[in-house]
Amino acid sequence: MTTPSMEDYIEQIYMLIEEKGYARVSDIAEALAVHPSSVTKMVQKLDKDEYLIYEKYRGLVLTSKGKKIGKRLVYRHELLEQFLRIIGVDEEKIYNDVEGIEHHLSWNSIDRIGDLVQYFEEDDARKKDLKSIQKKTEHHNQ
């Protein structure tokens, strides 16, 4: 079972490897704004739990288990960003909002949010209807 912190690391490592082809402790530390020694400790734990293989000074490689969960975590993050955009959350608030909620939702909830995103993406009229409702409620709340 992964903790929210483990998930943040796995997600970041997965994204770095997808983007650069590799992930170094220094890259992970910079991306997560943490000290390299914290990264080393977590990477050793993730190695022990078989999410990745870590060789000091040689970098790290995600195992198939690590890749699978990494892909799912990136999907969850991107889906939540897409959902918040659809419902009209201010762009500058989206990242922090996703970071605040992503670890607290069950995968069942994520799947249902995915259904909602798909529903809105399939027909632009649905997005327009939502915006119309939001305008009415904004008007009533003023």
Swiss-Prot record:
Coiled-coil residues are none
Q: How is its activity regulated?
A: DNA binding is strongly activated by Mn(2+) and Cd(2+), but it is poorly activated by non-cognate metal cations, including Co(2+), Fe(2+), Ni(2+), Ca(2+) and Zn(2+). In the strict absence of divalent transition metal ions, MntR has a low affinity for DNA.
* Tagged with keyword Nucleotide-binding: no
Provide GO CC annotations from the record.
cytoplasm
Instruction: Report the outcome of H77A.
Output: Retains selectivity for activation by Mn(2+) and Cd(2+) over Co(2+) and Fe(2+). Can bind Mn(2+) in the C site, despite alteration to the A site, and adopt active DNA-binding conformations
- Residue positions annotated to bind Cd(2+) 2 are E11, H77, E99, E102
Does the keyword field hold Manganese? yes
Annotated compartments? Cytoplasm
SUPFAM superfamilies with a match to the protein in the record: Iron-dependent repressor protein, dimerization domain, Winged helix' DNA-binding domain
Q: Where is the HTH dtxR-type domain?
A: 1-63
**Which residues does the record give as Mn(2+) 1 binding sites?**
D8, E99, E102, H103
What result follows from mutating D8M?
Binds only one manganese ion, in a pseudo-hexacoordinate geometry
Impact noted for substituting E11K: Retains selectivity for activation by Mn(2+) and Cd(2+) over Co(2+) and Fe(2+). Can bind Mn(2+) in the C site, despite alteration to the A site, and adopt active DNA-binding conformations
Residues that hold Cd(2+) 1 according to the record:
D8, E99, E102, H103
Gene Ontology MF, one: DNA-binding transcription factor activity
How does the entry describe the domains?
Contains an N-terminal DNA-binding domain and a C-terminal dimerization domain. Contains two metal binding sites per subunit, site A (corresponding to metal ion 2) and site C (corresponding to metal ion 1), which both contribute to the metal selectivity of MntR. A large metal cation is needed at the A site to correctly orient and position the C site ligands. Smaller, non-cognate metal cations bind at the A site, but disrupt the C site, blocking the full activation of MntR. Binding at the C site also favors Mn(2+) and Cd(2+) over other metals.
The protein's assembly and partners? Homodimer.
Name used for this protein in its record: HTH-type transcriptional regulator MntR
**Organism for this UniProt entry:** Bacillus subtilis (strain 168)
What gene, per UniProt, encodes this protein? Answer: mntR
